[in-house]
């Protein structure tokens, strides 16, 4: 067995298992780590190590999630698995575990079930870009026609939610038999890993995306001008480049005349760094926290969007009572709260703590946003929900 060493040279990809309860997500997770460790080196994780998922807090929400890692010859994977359905809902909406692709586990003995559909819908809403299907428990189905029927149903379901159902890879396997070391079923796990490598494209790194910095603070420095500070979310800003100030007010243009970090002057600020950016020709009062600095044309301000939202339960410190249409909380984007109104789906009269729900939100000020942006719902500074922009409307 080769010594473990963390290779930074390999692309890093985030994946996870989704699907109906008891269809074998956790068993598959254990089988992947075990078979790939045996095939390519690395460490296996036992089923019970994965099933005892530790509690985590993401935006004040309690989520049980297991994280495992494994390697193929060309990539390093970080993989999340959740014990309960509610954990998946919270995980996907908060983006606590951002997935570059998901493995949808469907038991061949059952076919698609209610949570199968719900997880596909959630995947669509929160922007999981690719889904691969693992048809599990195939050792228990002798009838080839039945397997073909289940495959067809899964493809139709994926297509319903705008995933390419006809082109989605479907691997027929048995996670349990693979875990028990039966060669023909171990081969199916290696086949699945091959599809992870080939079907999920390498994710674009934050530093390669267009520049964006959420503004946290604004200062004026006499004789030099106005400085905004914040952590660069993505991309690079170079001294001398044009930037746009987006959100809350009319979009304005400026030029970056300096970048500093820890009181040192730099030529550029990069994704992940906390920097101050000096702006030419902008007055202190023309710019505020909650706006973003961005590469011109890369992001637009919007006020109305479709969202997928999780409302905290009472135990999580959320509301104790339901809310109704006409509810006007604050929506916290990046660095600031903006009041907004909501429209509930047809036939939904009220939303209870612990529910997840689709809602259309209209903000009183525009905010720089793209599909996939996460936000919190707050009442007087207290978080009562978490959400994601599923689709910008206007």
Curated annotation (Swiss-Prot):
One annotated Gene Ontology cellular component of this protein: cytosol
Disulfide bond annotation, renumbered to this chain: none
G4: region residues: 136-139
Catalytic activity annotation: GTP + H2O = GDP + phosphate + H(+)
Enzyme class: hydrolase
Source taxon at top rank: Bacteria
Annotated spans, G2: 60-64
Binding-site residues, Mg(2+): 26
Molecular function (Gene Ontology), one example: GTPase activity
Residues that coordinate or bind GTP: 19-26, 81-85, 136-139
Record has Hydrolase as a keyword: yes
Domain tr-type G: 10-204
Location of the region described as G1 in the Swiss-Prot/TrEMBL record: 19-26
Protein family per UniProt: Belongs to the TRAFAC class translation factor GTPase superfamily. Classic translation factor GTPase family. EF-Tu/EF-1A subfamily.
Known partners and oligomeric status: Monomer.
Protein name: Elongation factor Tu
Species this protein is from: Enterobacter sp. (strain 638)
Lineage: Bacteria, Pseudomonadati, Pseudomonadota, Gammaproteobacteria, Enterobacterales
């Amino acid at each position: 067995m080769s010594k473990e060493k963390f290779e930074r040279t390999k692309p890093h990809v985030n994946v996870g298992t989704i699907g109906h309860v008891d269809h074998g997500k956790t068993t598959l997770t254990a089988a992947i780590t075990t078979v790939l460790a045996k095939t390519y080196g690395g460490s296996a994780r036992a089923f019970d190590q994965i099933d005892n998922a530790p509690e985590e807090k993401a935006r004040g929400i309690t989520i049980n999630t297991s994280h495992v890692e494994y390697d193929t010859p060309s990539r390093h994977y970080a993989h999340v698995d959740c014990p309960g359905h509610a954990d998946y809902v919270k995980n996907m909406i908060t983006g606590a575990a951002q997935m570059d692709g998901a493995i949808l586990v469907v038991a061949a003995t059952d076919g698609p079930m209610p949570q199968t559909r719900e997880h596909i819908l959630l995947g669509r809403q929160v922007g999981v870009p690719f889904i691969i299907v693992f048809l599990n428990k195939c050792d228990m189905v002798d009838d080839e026609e039945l397997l073909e029927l289940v495959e067809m149903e899964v493809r139709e379901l994926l297509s319903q939610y705008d995933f390419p159902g006809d082109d989605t890879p479907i691997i027929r396997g048995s996670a349990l038999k693979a875990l028990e070391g039966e060669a023909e079923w171990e081969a199916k796990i290696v086949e699945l890993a091959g599809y992870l490598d080939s079907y999920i494209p390498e994710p674009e790194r934050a530093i390669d995306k267009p520049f964006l910095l959420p503004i946290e603070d604004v200062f004026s420095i006499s004789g030099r001008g106005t400085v905004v500070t914040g952590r660069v979310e993505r991309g690079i800003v170079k001294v001398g480049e044009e930037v746009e100030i987006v959100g809350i007010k009319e979009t304005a243009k400026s030029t970056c005349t300096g970048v500093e970090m820890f009181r040192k002057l730099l030529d550029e600020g990069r994704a992940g760094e906390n920097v101050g950016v000096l702006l030419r020709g902008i007055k202190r009062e023309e710019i505020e926290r909650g706006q973003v600095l961005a590469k011109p044309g890369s992001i637009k301000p919007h006020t109305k969007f479709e969202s997928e939202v999780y409302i905290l339960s009472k135990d999580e410190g959320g509301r104790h009572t339901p809310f109704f249409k006409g509810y006007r909380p604050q929506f916290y984007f990046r660095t600031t709260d903006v009041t907004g109104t909501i429209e509930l789906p047809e036939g939904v009269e009220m939303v209870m703590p612990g529910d997840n729900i689709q809602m259309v939100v209209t903000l009183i000020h525009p905010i720089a946003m793209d599909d996939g942006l996460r936000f919190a719902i707050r009442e007087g500074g207290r978080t009562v929900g978490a959400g994601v922009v599923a689709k910008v409307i206007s």
